[in-house]
Amino acid sequence: MKKTKIVATMSDFRCTEEFVKQLFDAGMDVVRVNSAHVSEDGATHIVETVHRVNPAIPIMIDTKGPEIRVTTIADEYGNSINFRPGDRVAVRGSDGSDFTTRKVVYMNVPSIVSDIPVGARMLIADGELEIRVVGKNDTELDCEFVVGGAMRSRKSVNVPGVSIDLPSVTEKDRRFIEWAVKNDVDFIAHSFVRSARDIRAVQDILDAHGSNIKIISKIENQEGLDNIDEIIEASYGIMVTRGDLGVELPAEVIPNTQRRIVEKCICAKRPVIIATQMLYSMVKSPRPTRAEVSDVASAIYERVDAVMLSDETAMGDFPVQSVETMARIAREIERDETHFKPMIDMDMVSVNHEITAQLARSAVRASTNLPIKYVVLDTKTGRTGRYLAAFRGRKTVMAVCYQLHAQRILALSYGVVPILRNQELSDRYHFLVDALEFLDQYRKLDDGDLMAIVGGSFGPDGGASYVEIANVQNIRKRNEEIVAQHNC
């Protein structure tokens, strides 16, 4: 079983039960839905189809997020306006109702003129066009094209190093978040997160509806990087989306930026996902480039929780092969035990005074020093499983969950295989039998096989309180004795 998880983006036009099953069998762990490219009806179709195939498959939905865009091009210009380097234009703010012309480029942020200083760079359409602000007055920016090209309607705008007054949650985002609450979604991946304030705005909506959906913060701009520590602290997990990030930052700094974010997430015991163009050539080709294989491998060597496919599975010609390729790369890289050393003796993972974190580290240390086959735990919220994942042990973690939501969210965590127990404990050891039965389906367990057990003496609500090492024979014998006592 691979330890690195795979997030696959799903589009409604190709989401059939057979297609979902093929991706799941190929190695997909989490389904992603991008609200920027799907309607609420389309998203509902995806969720219902996925959960008909397997209710345990988690769903992640991306918000569109606060972003700057050029308004619609005026009809007289057709689909685009061509600009050359040196051309001058005025840039003005708008509520979106004004049309862009050759003389005036409108952007969908009313405060754009006051927010952007003279000297700033504005990158349009992921950097295909670039303009520089050479002057301004109260109503408009005087701009000159540095890089020309065809400007089309609704293209994105990035302003590196400048903080723009954008709302934390757009009206469309709010509608989709409320939709997610009603439709059994597990993760909200919030786009263009700039600070903890943006996360709190999403959390306030979730709290108002009594939802336990987890927030994944997408790091896509310099402001998000500047506030990365507070964002990690406020989030359930982090997604490093290298597309927009690569527009704002020089390409050569992206690898170190990615590595630094991954290390911070592992330290904070937060799941981390690497995204954008990981196997992009497989949109049209049945095989990846060598550079793409190395990119995926590098992320896995960095010990990320998950790697993500976007266009490859949403619209590409080889979606199943893309997932299979990513899964093969993960399994091959994870065989390198000289590199994949557990993080039990490093200062990388924060333990502090948390009992669960101390127990998780002890269990991973035991599984490293003893011939233990699996680490087994039970969990109500998923926290114990997430903490065990942070120490990146070599042994698979079997997490027996008492709630479907806990099973789903743990599907995103490194090295964790979550299974569902339909009833809470009648005895503190009974969850081990469920784990053994599940493992027996994949591999015959010998009586002498050792297990590291992380459990609680005070029921699922009491949290983890002990680590125990036991062999399969003694676990089964103890369960037989407990069953016999209950039948008396």
What are these regions (language model features)?
Residues 1-488:
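Non-catalytic helical/linker scaffolds that mediate oligomerization, partner binding
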